[in-house]
């Protein structure tokens, strides 16, 4: 099966069918995997919980304008994730008096409808739309020079958290995954946001890079730290070497095929060359268990894998109900 999949991926890539292959193969496969994990009836419950969360996001009271230096927080988002983005940023804003500002980078599906839904809750939001992104990428990452990065971002939207947010821009940027919620002030994260000096990241429950340490270390030229999670990622945009990233991305695919965790692996390779600011693992929980989901003790939850049902069933409701610190 693995061999068949890799051959199919190869020919889809050669024929320029990256997006179509992703939709026709990977998305149905993801559905089957989820069905096997939680059962078909529970998938229906999950879909109901997601719709309930989406309606709740649209009904959140608007965030009031704040004073002080603006501190931008970036998300890649669109039609499928806008409400998760709103809840994540909203929960962060509730935990600080700093002038945090939402920046939503269009994943290609951020129509006027979803822009308006986000803006009614986060009135000061700034959108970076697909037309602007495409123009910028054509200027700084032209297809003829960066064919792998450009084609890969079409088939693999996660890569846009690198290309679309950072290419052709300057300065430090904090990028958060949308499937996270804050329950207490994230002191270390806010300290970094106020004065970024080195890249930052959070710690995963396991190492998930998609490629062998040997290949990654050979490409990066340094040992690769384990368990980097890109739910929290702070990078300096103008410090990224896009020729190098093109080489890394192309070589990984040529030698080991494409992988869902490639973006996390590439960022881990970038982080490996720096003395990074690692968010303290005791402050947050990646993939919280049922008890923690129902009664949060950590500052932050990152709801990956098996914790998704709890996120949609319980997590966001803590924000709506005005979660209070049990301590």
Q: What annotation goes with each model-predicted range?
A:
Residues 295-327:
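Long, low-complexity C-terminal extensions of enzymes
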Residues 205-207, 223-306:
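Catalytic core and acceptor-binding pocket of nucleotide-sugar-dependent glycosyltransferases
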Residues 115, 119-168:
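Active-site-proximal specificity loops/subdomain of glycosyltransferases
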Residues 1-61:
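Membrane-proximal basic amphipathic "stem/tether" segments
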Residues 157, 161-207:
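GT-A fold catalytic core of metal-dependent nucleotide-sugar glycosyltransferases
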């Amino acid at each position: 099966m693995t061999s068949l999949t890799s051959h199919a991926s190869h020919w889809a890539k050669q024929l320029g069918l990256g997006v179509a292959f992703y939709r026709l193969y990977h998305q149905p496969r993801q559905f089957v995997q989820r069905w096997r994990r939680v059962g078909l009836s529970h998938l229906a419950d999950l879909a109901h919980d997601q719709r309930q969360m989406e309606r709740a996001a649209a009904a959140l009271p608007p965030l009031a304008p704040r004073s002080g230096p603006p501190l931008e927080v970036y998300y890649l988002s669109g039609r499928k994730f806008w409400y998760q983005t709103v809840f994540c940023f909203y929960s962060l804003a509730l935990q600080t008096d700093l002038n945090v500002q939402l920046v939503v980078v269009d994943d290609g599906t951020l129509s006027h409808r979803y822009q308006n839904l986000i803006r009614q809750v986060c009135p000061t939001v700034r959108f970076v739309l697909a037309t602007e992104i495409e123009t910028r990428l054509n200027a700084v990452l032209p297809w003829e020079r960066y064919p792998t990065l450009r084609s890969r971002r079409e088939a693999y939207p996660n890569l846009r958290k690198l290309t679309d947010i950072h290419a052709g821009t300057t300065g430090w940027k904090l990028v958060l995954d949308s499937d996270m919620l804050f329950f207490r002030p994230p002191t270390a994260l806010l300290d970094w946001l106020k004065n970024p000096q080195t890249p930052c990241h959070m710690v995963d429950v396991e190492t998930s890079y998609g490629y062998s340490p040997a290949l990654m270390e050979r490409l990066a030229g340094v040992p690769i730290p384990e368990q980097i999670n890109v739910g929290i990622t702070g990078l300096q945009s103008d410090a990224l070497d896009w020729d190098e990233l093109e080489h890394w991305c192309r070589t990984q695919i040529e030698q080991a095929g494409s992988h869902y965790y490639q973006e996390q692996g590439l960022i881990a390779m970038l982080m490996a060359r720096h003395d990074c600011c690692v968010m303290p693992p005791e402050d947050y929980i990646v993939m919280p268990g049922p008890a923690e989901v129902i009664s949060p003790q950590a500052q932050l939850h990152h709801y990956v894998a098996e914790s998704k049902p709890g996120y949609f069933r319980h997590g966001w409701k803590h924000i709506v109900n005005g979660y209070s610190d049990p301590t």
